[in-house]
Amino acid sequence: MTDVSPLIDAMGLAPHPEGGHYRRTWTAPTHVDTPRGSRHSASAIIFLLDRDEEARWHLVHSDELWIWSGPGALEVHLGGSGDAPEADPRIVTLGSPAKTQASDASNPVQILVPAGT
């Protein structure tokens, strides 16, 4: 693991419940009623995983747009409907063409993770 403590401090990040660190950067002023109660209709966060960290597998209850801006690439595993992924999840590799090797230039830099996956 690299020492990302200076970056965490500089960006004002806090531990995220699913692993890594984050900071909420925007919250919509409108609310929607959900089975889990009233929630903001949208929000945005900065999310940081160190090189050797993984986010805990979890079911997302709302659509999530992941935008990758780090060096190298990030694998996002999709598929499953509960506490564990499917046996053969769909893997999408996100990578910034400007910051990865030429062979990675075809990788997208964002993905929509649909609610319920």
Regions found by a protein language model. Give the residues of each.
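Non-catalytic, conserved peripheral segments adjacent to functional cores
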Residues: 1-111
